[in-house]
Design a protein with these regions (language model features):
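Short beta-strand edge/turn micro-motifs at domain boundaries
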Residues: 4, 121-151
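Hydrophobic pocket/interface hotspot
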Residues: 30, 42-43, 50, 67, ...
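A short hydrophobic beta-strand element
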Residues: 97-107
């Protein structure tokens, strides 16, 4: 009986570890595609009725985006702004059918001469059902940086869609 329990527990822990590694790999791959200008792989991770909340601030990325069409517009704006993102750390909790993930996400823009034009960190709180994003809320480390970067883009004549 103990051997069966140990085997079952080991299988459960191993399965969870593998699932988390697969999810992190997929997210990393989707962010790499986003950085290369293709938002579609990341968009496919959202359910059709997903909700993305990106702060109530004074910049082009703030607002509540309901549904994949609205989220696609958010991602297009991200790409058009020449932002690049990288995953710093990810924490997972809950069962696969109702998982919550916290991701430390750093955004930056590097000028052609190598100078950093913008850098900010965001915590993404993501709720999923069976690996599909149903809700995401973004918490900016420094809201003034996002607003200043958006103001600079407007000075350069880049509207919200690039």
């Amino acid at each position: 009986m103990r051997a069966w329990f140990a085997a079952g527990a080991t299988t459960a822990f191993t399965g969870r570890y593998v699932l988390l590694r697969v999810l992190l790999h997929r997210f990393t791959r989707d962010v790499a595609a986003l950085n290369a200008g293709d938002h579609r792989p990341l968009l496919s991770a959202y359910r059709h009725d997903a909700v993305l909340r990106s702060g109530e601030l004074d910049h082009r990325w703030s607002g509540v985006y309901v549904g994949r069409d609205a989220i696609e517009e958010f991602l297009r704006t991200f790409v058009a702004s020449r932002l690049r993102g990288e995953i710093g750390a990810a924490y997972f909790g809950g069962p696969p059918w109702r998982m919550t993930t916290l991701v430390r996400f750093t955004t930056h823009v590097i000028a052609p001469n190598g100078a950093v034009r913008h850098r900010n960190r965001t915590i993404l709180q993501v709720r999923t059902k069976w690996g599909r994003i149903v809700e995401q809320e973004d918490f900016y480390e420094n809201t003034a940086r996002a607003e200043a970067f958006d103001a600079r883009l407007r000075q350069l004549g880049l509207d919200a869609t690039g």
